[in-house]
Each structure stands twice: as C-alpha cells, then as structure tokens.
Amino acid sequence: MTDGYGVVLVAKQFGIDFDAKPILHVKGGGSSAIATVNAWLSMGGEVKALSGRRDLPEELISKCNSELDANLFIDFDDSSDSDGLVLFPSYSSDLYALSNKIDGRWMLIAQHLLAWAVLFSPEEQKNLPSLDLLFRRLVLLETLT
C-alpha cells in the first residue's frame, strides 16, 4: 500500500495534478511497480508500461495502454535515460541535483508518512510533519555522519 500511494504523494509534491489524469510511464514489474500502477490508476491517472527486467502481470498490462507523453517516469530498474521528470526509487549517499530527477529518498519518506498516517497512528495524521520537511531533515542528518 505505501509503495504505490507513496509515489502518488511524491508526484503531488512535485506538482502533478491528478484532476488532469496524469500519465505515468513505469519500467519494472516487481511488487513496488505493481502497487504503484494500481495506486496511480485508482487516482484517475493513466499508465504506459515499459519493458524492463520484469514485466507487469498481464492483467495489469491490459490497463496500461496510454500512448501519451509521461508526466512522471518511474524506473524500478534504475536504467532510465528519460529527459522528463523521473523518480528513481533507489537511493545512495549521492543526491540527484538535476531538476528533472527525483531522488528515491522522497519515496522512502512518503512511504513512512503514509504508514504512520494510515496504519500506526491515524488519529495523529494532522500532526505529522510535511514530506518536504522530513526530506530536508533526512538530508541534514546524512551530512552529519
């Protein structure tokens, strides 16, 4: 649950409007890719599945028929050369400095925020910090080590 809706939360953070039926291009077919496609479709977006190391299940590929340009590209295979807005789910000690590359830390933080908001402490949802604040704090903490 948090993988897919974490990507939706990150997309919204980076200005993607789900009222406009945004297009997601996704490469990969593992559980995170499946959750992401399901969440994106449930929010009213459209998806184009690209071949990767693993493909999405056939019943999901049949729902991924967009031929439009992507508002967001997510690469679960870490092999993207897209010039558009790209989310790389994995991360290392290096931060992406390019404006069109979204560091995987955003997805990690979004997943944790959703877990707290939905699973662990829904009664405290309004008191949780913002995605942006947690990202800045994580980066700051990493510089201290």
PLM segments and residue spans:
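Glycine-rich adenosine-cofactor-binding loop
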Residues: M1-G4, A11-R54
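Hydrophobic, Leu/Ile/Phe/Ala-enriched alpha-helical segments that form helix-helix packing faces
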Residues: A11, G15, T36, W40, ...
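Short, solvent-exposed coil/turn linker segments
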Residues: I16-D17, K63-S66, S130
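Generic local-structure boundary detector
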Residues: F18, P22, V37, E58-L60, ...
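Glutamate identity and glutamate-enriched acidic tracts
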Residues: E46, E58-E59, E67, E123-E124, ...
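Rossmann-like adenosine-cofactor binding region
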Residues: E59-L108
